[in-house]
């Protein structure tokens, strides 16, 4: 009986632990609500599409330097967030696990910091997003 209840609790908690998948418009609206300039939203949604397919819970495979990328914007753990048991410059001052939650606030704030320090080209997928992009106007 205890095992049954444990399974029920796990089943209830699993969606919360798994993160969530957004779509282009829901991401644009949430980022706008967090104060991201509207003229940047098409670029951010493009980056999120190509980096994580809008999934908040993604941890990328190891990079050539052994680092990993986290969350909807695939933020690197060598420079921007603290992974368990590994050195990091942790410029965003947060755990990498904070980038994997349903609440995208930490991911957005950290991504904005990356942008302010390194520009859009900090994302390897930027070449997909640097030209014409579909308008996000229909999202609002």
From Swiss-Prot:
Record-linked InterPro entries: Glyco_hydro_22 (IPR001916), Glyco_hydro_22_CS (IPR019799), Glyco_hydro_22_lys (IPR000974), Lysozyme-like_dom_sf (IPR023346)
Coiled-coil residues: none
Function description: Unlikely to play an active role in the humoral immune defense. May have a function in the digestion of bacteria in the food.
Tissue expression as described in the entry: Found in the midgut, especially the epithelium of the gastric caeca.
Keywords (A to Z) from UniProt: Antimicrobial, Bacteriolytic enzyme, Disulfide bond, Glycosidase, Hydrolase, Signal
Active site positions, chain numbering: 51, 69
Gene3D superfamilies with a match to the protein in the record: 1.10.530.10
Domain C-type lysozyme: 20-140
Signal sequence bounds: 1-19
PROSITE patterns attached to this UniProt entry: GLYCOSYL_HYDROL_F22_1, GLYCOSYL_HYDROL_F22_2
Protein name as annotated: Lysozyme S
CDD domains per UniProt: LYZ_C_invert (cd16899)
Record gene name: LysS
Similarity section: Belongs to the glycosyl hydrolase 22 family.
Reactions that this protein is recorded to catalyse: Hydrolysis of (1->4)-beta-linkages between N-acetylmuramic acid and N-acetyl-D-glucosamine residues in a peptidoglycan and between N-acetyl-D-glucosamine residues in chitodextrins
Highest taxon, organism lineage: Eukaryota
Native source organism of the sequence: Drosophila melanogaster
